[in-house]
Regions:
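Periplasmic N-terminal accessory/gating domains of Gram-negative outer-membrane beta-barrel systems
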Residues: 70, 75-86, 99-204, 208-211, ...
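Transmembrane beta-barrel wall of Gram-negative outer-membrane proteins
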Residues: 242-339, 358-376, 561
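Transmembrane beta-barrel strands of outer-membrane/channel proteins
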Residues: 105, 218-226, 265-269, 330-336, ...
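C-terminal beta-signal and adjacent terminal beta-strands/loops
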Residues: 747-770, 794-863
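Gram-negative outer-membrane beta-barrel transporters
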Residues: 525, 641-655, 664-767
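Signature of Gram-negative outer-membrane beta-barrel scaffolds
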Residues: 301, 423, 435, 443, ...
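Membrane-embedded beta-barrel scaffold of Gram-negative outer-membrane proteins
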Residues: 378, 382, 576, 580, ...
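Periplasm-facing N-terminal accessory domains of Gram-negative outer-membrane beta-barrel systems
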Residues: 5-104, 109
Length: 863
């Protein structure tokens, strides 16, 4: 095989393979097969086979030509990350040059060679859905419940941008918010995944970003929107129609910058105001007479949104291919967000609530080098920087803290409402991580491909209170005292420097009768911290006890095998089996929170609670996944996929109670929690029925464990409940989930889509009587089921060389009030309580309902 120059980053490319035959069914040698508008191509060998490696994810026109044969082009060839696209073709012999024959490729309704559950959506498919951001796309997939993949905890998912981890090591969530305008492809792996992917136990989301184009291209989008409530009184708000609640403006330019250099630059501004409004009757510095129940409001009485968000975001890419067989690129993605989290308690004193500011940037260099016609390597360098602040005033010494005092309410005015003061809690979190990832790929022959590589991460994670405000008696009077880095009781902001590394090797064998994917991954983690040598003397302060000096944490090594097999049982049907071990080190924010054991210096038997102590020397959490499925392309446009899965979850973070030498007891994190998840998914995809397409995803699942949160056991013990581990449904367990998408489209004319999301109720813990019932089994009740419908309609027009469209999007079309939100423990209903007096604060809170109907009107253009 001969390959033409090309290159792209790891985790963003796939390959195209196939066979070229004559109209007499004989293989055709030396046919030129290339992707129009690119440098990617190959020649066929004696068997008529060709393979084009290292093709960036996207949609292409594949052209076949050779002297003595007709020229054919196949439009709409879709390439997905880390997957093989097969495109066979038949060329008719001819003695004269004939007009080119153009055919359109159709993605098969199921991919019979795929060995695990995964979905790849192209930019065109994403645009047609009523979604705006990456998370909207992810939550529509089978087996995903509000970010939980197949029953796992929310922090068990690896989010990647162009094949490199974009997770924040503090909580293992994505550092970025990605708008759909940036997405070339989204790959969601909810089953087992290759050895290349680590630091995840439940799933992988790989967002492939768009890149520069060979010709200059400019596109943009803008929309305005608001809320339209069917019955405001049910939601406890007064305004039925709230226009102007959100606005977005996005612009993207791409094209050639210089010879062999392409650029992409995209920017977006987005503003959102929540539908629940507050009234500024009070200001933080008001002086109400709380003893006599006499308020003294001095606010201006204006209506203001209790929650809002203003965001600037964007991306930049610069790609150069001047050097032979070399591709160098720089990319950056960023978000700047300023907003306020909705807190209904501040509805009359909105200026007393804290604001949140976020700055995130994910940027770096990529080097792709073709070493030979069948071998290439990728090397990526990234900085993942994330900064988050949550407080009312930036400076802890701001005199407005003294003037306002703590947030206070008066039940005589309105129970649960703060009418004076400000929130005194303060928090900041910064992650500055440097990542290196590299891999080498070799196409051994037309059947076997091998890949090996590794990655190294150096995160610096800081978090804590940037100054703690505490009221203390000084000279007989209540005085607001500042504590800045005053350990062990007020430690301030601390920085931690763990190291994560991994190496992997994997192979893919693709034959007409078998697809095999297998690999091994070796993970390394070192918290680079200390723990007490003897937990029974945690602060080395117990008289007469054996000494307990701090000792370094140990480095952890884990070897994880991965295996996937697909057997085509006929041309249009296949079965697959997948198995794998998946390890994940707990988030830095979890294991290091409250990890200074000097706080236990005065620990006495029967003493006060010190909370749950952190533990940086825990083992990695582990999940073993099993998956088996059957997929069948019933027709050229109708496919079905049935997959059964089981997850054995072990070594989850939980709480142990440690007995000290002086008969005291404290709680600390360790690997004691466990669980499992079992279920199946059914996907039916009808690509085309005239202009109509239908896709249905159904998930049945049962997810149980001994706790939904690492600190849950300690919480039960403090409440006087039985802390012993026992199986209960996870908080996010959901027996049934159904996603139905119906779309109708005519190319370059119109499109419309409706997405229906239906779900059975998640668990809750019932209460029998007011103040009683804590002994009820956790999560033994079920919330009501719910359904939400979203829709999108678009009309396209062409004005000279500009493609324009107008569209409307409606979220929660039927204005549903409930979808697995808050319920009252006495009734299991979100609407009423058996104990209205004790639950009055919650009954008055409209934020417990699902977000109301939201209408957006927008326009797009491209030229």
């Amino acid at each position: 095989l001969a390959f033409v120059a090309g290159g792209a980053e790891a985790g963003t490319t796939g390959k195209i393979t196939g066979r070229v035959l004559s109209d007499k069914k004989a293989p055709v040698l030396a046919v030129t097969c290339f992707l129009e508008g690119t440098r990617f191509g190959a020649y066929t060998n004696e068997q008529g086979q060709y393979t084009i490696l290292n093709v960036p994810a996207g949609t292409y026109t594949l052209r076949f030509q050779r002297v003595g044969y007709e020229i054919k082009s196949v439009q709409g060839v879709v390439v997905s990350s880390d997957q093989t696209t097969t495109q066979d073709i038949v060329l008719g012999e001819t003695a004269i040059q004939m007009q080119e024959v153009v055919v359109t490729a159709e993605r098969p309704p199921v991919e019979v060679s795929v060995t695990s559950s995964q979905v790849s959506l192209t930019a065109k498919e994403i645009k047609a859905l009523p979604v705006q951001e990456l998370n909207d796309v992810v939550n529509l997939q089978a087996g995903v419940v509000d970010g939980h993949f197949r029953g796992g905890r929310k922090d068990e998912v690896q989010y990647q941008v162009d094949g490199v981890s974009a997770n924040n090591a503090y909580d293992n969530s994505s550092s970025l918010r990605l708008d759909r305008s940036l997405l070339q492809e989204v790959q969601v792996i909810s089953g087992t995944f290759d050895a290349e992917y680590g630091q995840a136990m439940s799933g992988v989301v790989n967002a492939v970003l768009k890149q520069g184009t060979e010709k200059f291209h400019l596109e943009g989008e803008g929309y305005l929107g608001g809320f339209l409530l069917s019955d405001p009184s049910v939601r406890l708000v007064s305004d039925q129609f709230q226009p102007g609640a959100l606005a977005s403006l996005q612009l993207t330019a791409s094209g050639p910058l210089a010879k062999n250099t392409l650029f992409l630059l995209s920017g977006r501004y987005y503003h959102f105001e929540d539908y629940v409004k507050g009234t500024r009757l009070f200001v933080p510095t008001d002086s109400s007479d709380f003893e006599n129940g006499i308020p003294h409001p001095t606010g201006d009485g204006k209506s203001v949104p209790l929650g809002y968000s203003s965001e600037w975001g964007g991306a930049a890419k610069l790609t150069n291919t001047s050097l032979h067989n070399t591709k160098l690129s720089y990319q950056a993605v960023w978000n700047v967000v300023d907003g306020k989290r909705m807190q209904y308690a501040y509805r009359f004193n909105p200026d007393g609530a804290p604001t949140q500011q976020t700055f995130a940037i994910f940027h770096g260099l990529d080097w792709n080098q073709i070493l030979s016609k069948s071998t290439y390597f990728d090397l990526s360098f990234r900085q993942n920087y994330f900064d988050y602040n949550d407080y009312v005033y930036e400076d802890v010494f701001d005199p407005r803290y003294d003037a306002a005092g703590p947030a206070r309410g008066d039940p005589g005015f309105e129970d649960g409402a703060f009418i004076q003061g400000v929130e005194l809690n303060r928090f900041t979190q910064t992650t500055n991580a440097f990542l290196i990832k590299g891999s080498v790929v070799n196409q051994v022959n037309s059947i076997v491909q091998v890949k090996a590589g590794g990655e190294l991460q150096f995160p610096a994670v800081s978090f804590g209170s940037p100054g703690t405000l505490v009221y203390t008696i000084v000279n007989g009077q209540q005085t607001l005292v500042r504590h800045v880095d005053d350990p062990p009781d007020y430690p301030g902001v601390k920085t931690y420097h763990p190291v994560l590394a991994a190496t992997f090797a994997q192979a893919v064998v693709e034959r007409p009768t078998l697809t095999f994917r297998g690999g091994l991954r070796l993970d390394y983690f070192d918290a680079r911290s200390t723990v007490p040598s003897d937990p029974a003397n945690p602060a080395n302060s117990i008289a007469g006890a054996p000494p307990s000096e701090p000792v370094p944490t140990t480095a952890k090594f884990k070897l994880a095998p991965r295996l996937g097999i697909a057997f085509p049982i006929e041309k249009r049907a296949a079965v697959h089996f997948a198995y794998g071990h998946f390890y994940q080190y707990p988030s830095i924010g979890t294991i290091f929170t409250n990890s200074d054991y000097n706080t236990l210096n005065d620990l006495q038997a029967g003493g006060v609670s010190y909370g749950v102590l952190g533990n940086p020397d825990v083992q990695p959490e582990k999940t073993i996944q099993y998956e088996m499925g059957y997929k069948h392309a019933i027709t050229d446009n109708l496919g079905a996929d049935l997959t059964v899965f089981y997850k054995d979850i072990r070594n989850l973070l939980g709480v142990e109670f440690v007995q000290t030498y002086n008969d005291a007891e404290y709680a600390r994190l360790t690997n004691v929690d466990f669980g499992d998840a079992v279920g199946f998914t059914l996907a039916i995809d009808h690509r085309r029925l005239g202009p109509v397409a239908v896709a249905l995803d159904y998930t049945w699942m049962e997810a149980l464990g001994n706790s939904s949160d690492p600190r849950e056991t300690a919480t039960r013990a403090e409440a006087g409940e039985d802390p012993r581990p026992r199986l209960a449904y996870f908080n996010w367990d959901q027996r049934h989930k159904l996603d139905l998408t119906v779309s109708m489209a005519r190319s370059d004319d119109y499109s419309a889509s409706i997405v229906l999301r239906a779900a059975s109720g998640q668990p809750y813990t019932p209460v029998l009587e007011s103040g009683f019932g804590n002994g009820q089994e956790p999560n033994s009740g079920r919330k009501p089921s719910g359904m939400v419908i979203d829709m999108r309609g678009e009309k396209t027009v062409k004005v000279k060389n500009t493609n324009m469209s107008v569209y409307a999007r409606v979220y929660n079309l039927l204005d549903s009030k409930f979808l697995n939100g808050t319920v009252f423990n006495s009734t299991g209903s979100p609407y009423y309580s058996r104990f209205p007096e004790s639950d009055q604060v919650t009954l008055n809170d409209p934020t417990r309902f699902y977000a109301p109907r939201r209408i957006e009107l927008g326009v797009t253009f491209g030229m």
